[in-house]
Amino acid sequence: VSHLLVNQIISHHTGLHDFGDVENILKERLLSKEINEGDISINKPLLFQEFIDSPFSKSKVEWKHFHHLSRMLFSCLVDADRLDTERFMDVESWRKRGNSATLADLLPQLEAYMQKLQSNAADTKVNRIRQQVKEQCSRTSSSEKGFYSLTVPTGGGKTLSSLLWAMKHAVSHSMNRIIIAIPYTSIIVQTAGLLKEIFGEENVLEHHSNFDPDDIKDEENREKAKLATENWDYPIIVTTNVQLFESMFSNKTSDCRKLHNMANSILVLDEVQMLPTGFLRPIVDALKAYQEMFGVSVLFTTASQPVLSGLIEGTNPKADFKGIEHIKEIIPEEFALHDQLRRVKLSIDDTGKTYDEIAAKVSEYNKVLCIVNTRKDAKELYDRLPNDGVKLHLSRMMCPAHLHDC
């Protein structure tokens, strides 16, 4: 424990050190200066008493998860140090932090929004299924903390229903925030836009490479968002898988600072099948650690759930590892959503085609989506299409602003 706490203290300006380096670093620092007796007084109050008395400290820490505990304590110290300095040096910025709505405050707004959608929706099969999914999410939301999955095909209302489950689950367990991690920035922009429409931009933080807080028109919200990217002190955060998991394994002060605000929160991993298989073992271990030690609930959402429980096979037998022990599916099998929402019939033609042949085939339809393997293929095919009507080229050769305009 002494090494654990010492490492936080000597690292909070430089980045978290490896455990093996702590003793040598400490010796060097102690030998380089004379220590005043007042510096080591034992009459000062125990600053960690609140943490020691908290539920998190009562959980058993496996050795393989010890580095997550180290980072969590490091995060607490770094953020407290930065906020204390900010309160002294820049009190105006300090006053702009926090004061956000709680999830309990925001839940009625979501329920009202979903009720309005339902009232205005036509009585169709798809809308009845969406309502069924919503009601099931609402019914199961008060279940105990843990791992959950929501498997809903495209068009089944997964985005709003998963958010309803997460918010009601959070309110049931007095949890602090919802963190939504998505693999693609294009989906993040759409999701964040919807959430801001429901809750207001002052309650939804976007944190990804394509978002510039300077684009926020309201000055107060703009400054709050800039500050909140440092420590995620918002009720709802929408971010990338990269931002989330790099922070969990980083030793940098800037990355680790936000980690303590992930404790007692809900992680919603959208399109979970896109988790990189090469990093699946440390990701799964991290999620298990955060659930067991820091009171986190995890919701996996997708149309096609990957295998994350039981024995997960690696690239060779030695790389096999134990997944999550129990993931509770929210939607029961008898709902048969995949059968009810099946809207696509696959017809596979494995013969080779030239660009001109594909262009001719595409031109036969009034509305058509053509997906190809590479950006070069997309450009070649686009150039061969006739100019009558509307044709759009979408690829990462375009800048994000132009993609958004399309």
Annotate each language-model stretch with its function:
Residues S304-S363:
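Interdomain hinge/linker at the junction between the two RecA-like core domains of SF2 helicases
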